[in-house]
């Protein structure tokens, strides 16, 4: 007869952060007798779910994708922005073999180094500090012809904010005594992602032919002329920057071209125009054979050099379970199904051996404040059945309510969402205890605990950078450890299951069996 398994259950209450202040706090305002009792009577602690502790920039709010990757990985997983910040700070960036190789090859052949990217402090698609580091790398390695092609932002930054960035780079080139800003164009053209190839073509011609609708002696003059035409940063038309007597910066075969955007979606189209031999988005007036480097991998089918290939995560929680012949279930509503599967598995789409998945449809409503309980009753019913089935060694479940209803900014609805969750937690905890299992309750980031922005008085619809609760329910006598973070959860689960923790997991168990 099959032995009935006593599952280790992880319940992730999405957007359920911890905030001492009671004002505009849907979690405090809700009637939550179950969570209150668990917090009062069970081992518990607070853990970090934002900023550096989850691989984001300092104090940046967490999000569901990052949260679940860290939860499943058992180690801090650095996002591209932070990974680059760290590498530049410790100077590993300046020794990156792909970047140095491209620069050295161009320099030794007397060719130019072209650097292009979104010149922005927004930190969403790129960061100007990374572009500055690339300029320094090229100069340090002796490149004489360094051309910067600046894509202007105005979406992740204020609509007219590019001047200070352009000034900074013009001053840098003056100090270096070589290199210059060679072109400016709005991201509307250079960073399209909807196959509007007529836009991309304007950027491509500007880069390859050094031909644009306008020309200016300096980047700042070119920008000011665009503003006079009533073009904000995002929509600045193709402008060649070239003073009298300066050589033109048209791209030639053998030149190096470094694309400094780290986010893929808006980098793919213009990259394909340079890299794909069979490109058919538009008829290219000039096909150049440049040494093209993508800062990160924009798509697996774009065959060109990558300075920072995706870091593959070995021995995530899901993979480790499979290697140890354990059974696991992932269960959530539509809104967070990808998070407990793809993201929790470190970006792996396929399920592991012994991994089942249950998807509960989220309600078809315009906004979730209209149905704050969402599909939590059905989700709980299926989860309780799975706990009692004896089939699973571990179960990962996400309740989306705190986040999805928190995003609406409607306080009354968020309170109802939290109250619905309290009933669900009660059912789940009872089921786990009835089969002798163990339960961890936590969150991936905050949201519902802050429903109004104190500075503006407007509804606060974003995530927070506040800590999240972690509660243990089970028959083990455990002591909580302070100072934890999301990447400590997987090691905590393994330790409570009496399993070895793989060496790749650098997180630490947060409940120590006494």
Swiss-Prot record:
<comment type="subunit">
    <text>Monomer.</text>
</comment>
<feature type="binding site">
    <location>
        <begin position="155"/>
        <end position="156"/>
    </location>
    <ligand>
        <name>substrate</name>
    </ligand>
</feature>
<feature type="binding site">
    <location>
        <begin position="263"/>
        <end position="266"/>
    </location>
    <ligand>
        <name>substrate</name>
    </ligand>
</feature>
<dbReference type="InterPro" id="IPR006124">
    <property type="entry name" value="Metalloenzyme"/>
</dbReference>
<feature type="binding site">
    <location>
        <position position="125"/>
    </location>
    <ligand>
        <name>substrate</name>
    </ligand>
</feature>
<comment type="function">
    <text>Catalyzes the interconversion of 2-phosphoglycerate (2-PGA) and 3-phosphoglycerate (3-PGA).</text>
</comment>
<dbReference type="InterPro" id="IPR017850">
    <property type="entry name" value="Alkaline_phosphatase_core_sf"/>
</dbReference>
<dbReference type="GO" id="GO:0005975">
    <property type="term" value="P:carbohydrate metabolic process"/>
</dbReference>
<dbReference type="GO" id="GO:0005737">
    <property type="term" value="C:cytoplasm"/>
</dbReference>
<dbReference type="GO" id="GO:0006979">
    <property type="term" value="P:response to oxidative stress"/>
</dbReference>
<dbReference type="InterPro" id="IPR011258">
    <property type="entry name" value="BPG-indep_PGM_N"/>
</dbReference>
<feature type="binding site">
    <location>
        <position position="403"/>
    </location>
    <ligand>
        <name>Mn(2+) 1</name>
    </ligand>
</feature>
<keyword id="KW-0479">Metal-binding</keyword>
<dbReference type="Pfam" id="PF01676">
    <property type="entry name" value="Metalloenzyme"/>
</dbReference>
<dbReference type="GO" id="GO:0005829">
    <property type="term" value="C:cytosol"/>
</dbReference>
<dbReference type="GO" id="GO:0004619">
    <property type="term" value="F:phosphoglycerate mutase activity"/>
</dbReference>
<feature type="binding site">
    <location>
        <position position="407"/>
    </location>
    <ligand>
        <name>Mn(2+) 1</name>
    </ligand>
</feature>
<feature type="binding site">
    <location>
        <position position="336"/>
    </location>
    <ligand>
        <name>substrate</name>
    </ligand>
</feature>
<feature type="binding site">
    <location>
        <position position="444"/>
    </location>
    <ligand>
        <name>Mn(2+) 2</name>
    </ligand>
</feature>
<dbReference type="GO" id="GO:0030145">
    <property type="term" value="F:manganese ion binding"/>
</dbReference>
<dbReference type="InterPro" id="IPR005995">
    <property type="entry name" value="Pgm_bpd_ind"/>
</dbReference>
<feature type="binding site">
    <location>
        <position position="193"/>
    </location>
    <ligand>
        <name>substrate</name>
    </ligand>
</feature>
<feature type="active site" description="Phosphoserine intermediate">
    <location>
        <position position="64"/>
    </location>
</feature>
<dbReference type="GO" id="GO:0006096">
    <property type="term" value="P:glycolytic process"/>
</dbReference>
<keyword id="KW-0413">Isomerase</keyword>
<protein>
    <recommendedName>
        <fullName>2,3-bisphosphoglycerate-independent phosphoglycerate mutase</fullName>
        <ecNumber>5.4.2.12</ecNumber>
    </recommendedName>
</protein>
<keyword id="KW-0324">Glycolysis</keyword>
<feature type="binding site">
    <location>
        <position position="463"/>
    </location>
    <ligand>
        <name>Mn(2+) 1</name>
    </ligand>
</feature>
<feature type="binding site">
    <location>
        <position position="14"/>
    </location>
    <ligand>
        <name>Mn(2+) 2</name>
    </ligand>
</feature>
<dbReference type="InterPro" id="IPR036646">
    <property type="entry name" value="PGAM_B_sf"/>
</dbReference>
<dbReference type="GO" id="GO:0006007">
    <property type="term" value="P:glucose catabolic process"/>
</dbReference>
<comment type="pathway">
    <text>Carbohydrate degradation; glycolysis; pyruvate from D-glyceraldehyde 3-phosphate: step 3/5.</text>
</comment>
<dbReference type="Pfam" id="PF06415">
    <property type="entry name" value="iPGM_N"/>
</dbReference>
<feature type="binding site">
    <location>
        <position position="445"/>
    </location>
    <ligand>
        <name>Mn(2+) 2</name>
    </ligand>
</feature>
<feature type="binding site">
    <location>
        <position position="64"/>
    </location>
    <ligand>
        <name>Mn(2+) 2</name>
    </ligand>
</feature>
<feature type="binding site">
    <location>
        <position position="187"/>
    </location>
    <ligand>
        <name>substrate</name>
    </ligand>
</feature>
<comment type="similarity">
    <text>Belongs to the BPG-independent phosphoglycerate mutase family.</text>
</comment>
<keyword id="KW-0464">Manganese</keyword>
